[in-house]
Amino acid sequence: MQLTPRSVHLVHLLLAATTLISPSWSNHQSQQPALQALSPDDTLFAHLRCFELFASGQQSRDRDADAADWLGGNRERYLHRVERTPAFVKCVLGRMHFYDSSERRFNVNILRTQYNAYKQWMTLSEEDVDDFIHEVSNIGALNSSNDAEVYDALKLLFTNHSVSFFQLFLRDPTVLQNMYDDKSLSVRKPNQTVVQFCELQMAAELWDDICLIRAYQISNHTEAMERHIACIFRGFQYLDANSSIDVKEIVRDYELTETLDEASKNSIEECARNASEKDDIPKRSLAMYSCLLDGSHSEVFKKAFDFREVRSGNLTFLVQNLPYDRDQVRQQILALDKEHCNDQQPLAGRFIED
């Protein structure tokens, strides 16, 4: 499908935001605290996933408008109300842990957590944050957690605190640019996939095995391989906020490639149970990855994994709601392979003909 000029602009806008993702925690090996700060990757993913769930389903101007309003980083347009907006807003607030539907309350703790983690890149003062927290606290419990009531509550907060909201949840372009300019942070570049980013972070001893790894083989440099796969799983959101295997997220990628059936779903669940016995996050990640590559369902996993890699560096798929095209994905994956591997290097097993 041809993109409209407006759609092309939106894709470029979104990819600019993607350059600012910094999963610097991707190799952490310890369990994370119960309420950890959200990274730019986390808050962007919350918006992208809720966009997928609630934007206009058609490849149309309505979908373009939803992308511009919800993903464009414009405070004045963010809460522009159409029938889909309240559901999107509640979805985002829940995924960012700012609203608890079961308690019917906003969570002020996440505001302080975000500020403490990222204040060096923000223009907010302690007083700004305290005022925001005070006003959020004064709201108390809502009468219900229906979409409209949550939306109305956030809109009221936006009257005085839209700048604070955008900065604390890392959707403000200035804050993101400040983070991008800080050379001490690792950031993902425009059109760079999660796998490409993680390849640049991986240990030197893995580089001799890069073609084998891209062909879904496991390097003998076990600890480095564990950290590499953990980085990818973080970026793909295959690990949840507690660093547990997110079965639903993996299942979803199988659904998008139309390869999910009862047997493959059972295989994913069994692999997750076994991998979860590993206390160490990198070991858990590699155990899950290895299990999914083992047995009769390995090829469907590769299809899902390849599509996830391509989509992570090309938001056209999301903005335009484009379906899975096996030949197109294969061509893009082979192009990525050739960045590291020539025709003489080992890529055997990369693809099995359908």
From Swiss-Prot:
Gene3D superfamilies linked: Pheromone/general odorant binding protein domain
Q: Which GO terms describe its biological process?
A: vasodilation
The SS bond pairs are none
Which is an annotated GO molecular function term of this record? toxin activity
Name the keywords, alphabetized: Hemostasis impairing toxin, Platelet aggregation inhibiting toxin, Secreted, Signal, Toxin, Vasoactive, Vasodilator
First and last residue of the signal peptide: 1-26
Primary location: secreted
Q: Which InterPro entries match?
A: PBP/GOBP (IPR006170), PBP_GOBP_sf (IPR036728)
One GO cellular component from the entry? extracellular region
Q: Where does it localize?
A: Secreted
Similarity annotation: Belongs to the PBP/GOBP family.
The role this protein plays is: Modulates blood feeding of female mosquitoes on vertebrate species by binding and sequestering different mediators involved in the host response. Binds serotonin with high affinity. Binds weakly noradrenaline and histamine. Does not bind tryptamine, octopamine, dopamine, adrenaline, leukotriene C4, leukotriene D4, leukotriene B4, ADP and U-46619, a stable analog of thromboxane A2. Inhibits agonist-induced platelet aggregation. Exhibits vasodilating activity.
Protein name from the UniProt record: Long form salivary protein D7L3
Q: What is the lineage of its organism?
A: Eukaryota, Metazoa, Ecdysozoa, Arthropoda, Hexapoda
